[in-house]
Swiss-Prot record:
Protein name as it appears in the record: Arginine--tRNA ligase
GO MF annotation terms: arginine-tRNA ligase activity; ATP binding
Organism domain of life: Bacteria
Catalysed reactions, as listed in the record: tRNA(Arg) + L-arginine + ATP = L-arginyl-tRNA(Arg) + AMP + diphosphate
Species assigned in the record: Vibrio campbellii (strain ATCC BAA-1116)
Record's keyword annotation contains Aminoacyl-tRNA synthetase: yes
Organism lineage: Bacteria, Pseudomonadati, Pseudomonadota, Gammaproteobacteria, Vibrionales
Length: 577
């Protein structure tokens, strides 16, 4: 149950009954401190100001008609007109019982929407590097959360699979095939192959002529060029899939929707923009001038949709892409997990999309931007030699470091178990270090911090789960075979349940805002609340069997909530570490 939403509705009804205009925001939030209750309604002051009345007097009017029977044990007016709400122990215990009995932990499904999520988007014939990490794992965490809430999510891996560079790549692939027979689908060093192709293009005129010819042929649908192009795409996506699988990312080959998919739409879109009077000729190119964006001289900015040589640009593809996602995929929301430097480009494309009537305002186009991954020096994360860090190399190093960590903690474990634990911890550490940061900020990549067993880290959260799970091993009972009712006998129990009941609020926030760090913060706070409860409230040596069973139920709900929360982030738990 979303208790925040429930109370928000109740306060909204009371506001209206007390004389507030319909639709006035109740602004119910989780309280910052226990002395202010579990929730606080902050909307009274704004409404009182509009009505020209005393906020505290108006707050009292609201309280007089606020019906929280069976939910709150106490309400009070605080400060200039806040309403503090204290949940009743009976209500909390009842909600905890219901959550424990529900495989969804009490999280209600949303009214299903069709949501397209554009994330990862590596380039063909290039290896994935650390710059692809944020889009890939942030997007995947949000996608998992949306699916958990019952939405139909269409993953769109908008790979860079088109452009003039394919002429030289096809020409080089043909050369390799002629020299060594059929090309292995490994093509182990894609970066090297790309560099070699570029070198040949720059230094060998005969090769360059052939490459330029292949660009034209590919764009004209030539069978040989199309076959070679597909081979390059296949080789790249096989390699990328290894990274996705290692990272426990839910993308597959079926989710690829590359730039090339929209090629046939581009001429029609430019023709339509011209027919609507949106695109005009300027210096031989087709340009849409947007009053919403100004250049440095304060003039309407021109966005080129077709070059003077007839070629199309990324903006044209992005216009086609948004149109396709609405018209063909039936999207209600489209989420783009693309770095913050692309914001203006996207806004311009979407402005054209709206003006042309391709996507109605009822469909939400959302740029979920993210910052950069930095080294300890505060500069973009690079190798010691100053090069781009391959994603596969980063994951390899994470596994080596995690293996050393597990060896130092548990040298007595069997080798295969140590390896399995190390791999799980390694991928979790890389992902959680990123996901736990607000996505719009840059963050510093630090091996020591991400593999620490203290603080808001993956190892800490995975250990928190194993610690709770170990209680049941010691008790000799299953989490799913507990008797009796949950009864609150201590403030620490109440605080733990109150935090457990905020799980749905965290899930909804991640889905709404595209911010996985909200879930990380919630789980970290939950682990802290469990530690306080565990220290203050003996479980295995509780004063009687009823209290023991009740506390075991709270431990079970905590374990299940941590496991489910980490699962939504694409992170696995371990039964022992």
């Amino acid at each position: 149950m979303n208790i925040q939403a429930l109370i928000n509705d109740k306060v909204s009804q009371a506001l209206e009954a007390a004389g507030a205009p319909a639709g006035s925001p109740a602004a119910v939030r989780q309280s910052a401190k226990p002395q202010f209750g579990d929730y606080q309604a902050n909307g009274v002051m704004g409404v009182a100001k509009k009505l020209g009345t005393n906020p505290r007097e108006f707050a009292q009017k609201v309280l007089d008609v606020l019906d929280l029977d069976g939910i709150a044990s106490k309400t009070e007016i605080a400060g200039p007109g806040f309403i503090n709400i204290f949940l009743s122990e009976e209500f909390l215990a009842k909600q905890a019982e219901a959550a424990l009995a529900d495989s969804r932990l009490g999280v209600a499904a949303d009214e299903a929407q069709t949501i397209v999520a554009d994330y990862s988007a590596p380039n063909v014939a290039k290896e994935m590097h650390v710059g692809h990490l944020r889009s890939t794992i942030i997007g995947d965490a949000v996608v998992r959360t949306l699916e958990f809430l019952g939405h139909k999510v269409i993953r769109a891996n908008h790979i860079g699979d088109w452009g003039t560079q394919f002429g030289m790549l096809i020409a080089n692939l043909e050369r390799v095939q002629q020299e060594s027979g059929e090309v292995s689908m490994e093509l182990a060093d894609l970066e090297g192959f790309y560099r070699e192709s570029k070198k040949l293009y720059d230094e060998d005129e005969e090769f360059a002529v052939k490459a330029r010819n292949y660009v034209v042929k590919l764009q004209s649908g030539d069978e040989f060029c199309a076959e070679m192009w597909k081979k390059l795409v296949d080789v790249t996506m096989i390699q990328n899939q290894r990274n996705y699988d290692r990272l426990n990312v839910s993308l597959s080959r079926d989710d690829v929707m590359g730039e090339s998919m929209y090629n046939d739409m581009l001429p029609k879109i430019v023709a339509d923009l011209k027919a609507q009077g949106l695109a005009v000729e300027d210096d031989g190119a087709q340009v849409v001038f947007l009053e919403e964006f100004k250049n440095k001289d304060g003039e309407a900015m021109g966005v080129i949709v077709q070059k003077r040589d007839g070629g199309f640009l990324y903006t044209t593809t992005d216009i086609a892409c948004a149109k396709y996602r609405y018209e063909e995929l039936g999207a209600d929301r489209v989420l783009y997990f693309i770095d913050s430097r692309q914001h203006q480009h996207l806004m311009q494309a979407w402005t054209i999309v709206r003006k042309a009537g391709y996507v109605p305002e009822s469909v939400s186009l959302e740029h979920h931007a993210f910052g950069m991954m930095l080294g300890k020096d505060g500069k973009p994360f690079k190798t010691r030699a100053g090069g781009t860090v391959r994603l596969a190399d980063l994951l390899d190093e994470a596994e080596v470091r995690a293996a050393q960590l597990i060896e130092s903690k548990n040298p007595e474990l069997a080798e295969d178990e140590k390896k399995a634990i190390a791999n799980t911890v390694a991928m979790a550490a890389v992902k959680y270090a990123d996901l736990s940061k607000h996505r719009t900020t840059d963050y510093v990549f630090d091996w020591d911090n991400m593999l620490a067993f203290e603080g808001n880290t993956a190892p800490y959260m995975q250990y928190a789960y194993t610690r709770v799970a170990s209680v049941f091993a010691k008790a000799g009972v299953s989490m799913d075979d507990l008797q009796g009712e949950i009864k609150i006998t201590d403030e620490k129990e109440k605080a733990l349940i109150a935090k457990l009941m905020q799980f749905e609020e965290a899930v909804q926030s991640v889905a709404r805002e595209g911010q996985p760090h909200i879930m990380c913060s919630y789980l970290f706070e939950l682990a802290g609340q469990f530690s306080s409860f565990y220290e203050a409230c003996p479980i295995l040596v509780a004063e009687d069997e009823a209290v023991k069973q009740s506390r075991l139920k709270l431990a079970a709900l905590t374990a299940k909530t941590i496991k489910q929360g980490l699962s939504l982030l694409g992170i696995d738990t371990l039964e022992r570490m």
